Amino acid sequence: MSKILVLGYLGLRTNQLDGQTVKTRDLYKLASQEFDDVDLYDTEDFKFKKLSIFKMFWKVITCRTIIYLPAHNNLKSIFPIIFVLSKFFRTNIHYFVVGGWLREFLANLPLHRFMLSHISGIHTETQRLKSELEMCYNFKNVDVFPNFRFFDFQPSRTQSDKLRVVFMARVNKMKGLDWIFNLAEYIALNRLEDKITLSFYGPIHDEDREYFEAELSKYPFAEYNGVLQPSEIHQTLNDYDLMLLPTHYYTEGLPGSIIDAYISGIPVIVTEWKHAREFVDNGICGYIIPFENGEPELIEQVLMLMNNRDVLQELQIGALAKRQVFAPPTIDFILN
């Protein structure tokens, strides 16, 4: 019998890299470092072998503790079965939440609320989500377990006459591509191409590919450099000055790209999504711009940093200090 099962979307077959898969892999690594007997089940297997769901159920009933990281569909459809099995076989479930959407998701799911209130623990990325679950649904089993990264990287800042701006996330309109391309248009119209570069990294969302490639082709100072493997991220970001993430997802949790920026010692400019102020100290390790109609301020802040390298350097120092908050925690509490 396995002591611990990590159950979630790891994306191992296709090497899919996004916030969900990276956090699930990191939790598996963390559990493997702390405990001797750790198994895993990658729910991506459902896409390739439908009958593998029975393999998952077998793993569920033969383990002591589940580290559970479901996305929306898994939580809605599979979790009720896992919950029932856990009660029959006395398995502890620890749900590590990815993102900040759970309160809204549960609004019309009273059965799911009941089940979640009776598992061993719900571990949210943000204090605000913890408070919402307690206040809205009277959950008593919630704590905060922030997103994290493994790192021993030491930045060595390189110098450039240009402000090197980077976007690293899913290449998706909802991550703020439209605002970044509006910035690019401003740069082009004001002939600032010799002062700013824009680089994009990340998997391209199929529905937005045509839009992204068309916009990218307009600006010779903008480039797409593909998908970074986890081992490449920090060394690559080290060659940039500033990260943009003007997300339109209001219920973002803690985007992993922000942690990676801090580890690499570069500040961020983000929209004020629901949890932004828990993770970005405005004016210290980056800037928070309005969630609605924040494009003018995005352009203003980028231009200000282009012209004030002393301010940029102070933000870089603040970003590097902030990274210590996201060092790997311990999870020995799951066996209590």
Q: Could you tell me what each predicted segment is?
A:
Residues L5, R157-K175, W179-Y186, L198-S199:
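Conserved donor-binding/catalytic core segment of Leloir-type glycosyltransferases
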Residues S117-Q154:
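Donor nucleotide-sugar binding/catalytic pocket of nucleotide-sugar-dependent glycosyltransferases
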Residues I196-E210, G226:
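Glycosyltransferase donor-sugar binding loop
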Residues E210-S231:
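Nucleotide-activated donor-binding/catalytic signature segment of Leloir-type glycosyltransferases, i.e.
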Residues N238-E252, I266:
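Acidic donor-binding loop of glycosyltransferase active sites
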Residues I263, P267-T271:
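Short hydrophobic beta-strand element within catalytic cores of glycosyltransferases
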Residues N282-G283, Y287-G294, M304-R309:
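Conserved acidic donor-binding segment of nucleotide-sugar-dependent glycosyltransferases
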Residues M304, V311-V325:
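A short, well-ordered alpha-helix in the C-terminal region of glycosyltransferases
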